[in-house]
Amino acid sequence: MTRSSKASPGVFVALLRGVNVGGNNMISMSSLKQSFEGVGFTDVTTYINSGNIIFTTKENDARKLELKVEQMLSKEYGLGSKVVVRSLAEMEKLVKSLPPHWDSDSNWRYNVMFLRHTIDSEKVLADLPFNSDVEQVVYRPGTLLWSAQLSDINRTNMQKLSSKKIFQDMTVRNLNTTKKLCELMKKAAKT
C-alpha cells in the first residue's frame, strides 16, 4: 500500500550493488550522501564504504524509491546497477526472523541476500547454483539467508552465483552489517 504525500516520513535503507568492490565503481560515501540529499531525501547517513545509505522520506513505496535512486546513480555516477530498498519495518522483521543459531559460531559465515521485488519468491532457490553439501540457504520474504562453515567456503557456489543473470537482482550483506543497519535505522527513527 502506498501512502499519500501527506504521510509521515519513514526510514529506509538503500543497498547499492557493486559499489567500491574490487576497485570498481568507486564512489565516496560523502558524495553519495550529498546526492541522496540532492534528490530530496533527508537525515541521510552512510554505513561503511560499500553502499549502505539510510535516509528518511515521505514516499513509502520501495519500488518508486529504488527507481529514484537508480536514476540518480545513473545520472550522477554513470552506474547502471540495480538498488534494493528496505523500510525499517522490513529490516526489523528480517532481524527478528533470523535463525536463533545464527551468529553463535565464529567458524561459520552468515550472509543475507536481499532480493529485489522482481525475484522475491521462494521459487528463486531453484534457479540458484547452491551446493547443498556445504551451503545452507533459507528463504525469508525479501531475502535468502545463506550460511557455510569457513572451512568449506572454497567449496561453496557463491562465486558461480555472481555470474548468474539473476544475481543482478540481489545484493549481499553479511550478518553483522545487516544487524548494524537495522540498529542505525531504529536510531534514525527516534531522532
Named regions from a protein language model:
Residues R3-S50, I54-T191:
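Surface-exposed, charge/polar-rich loops and edge strands
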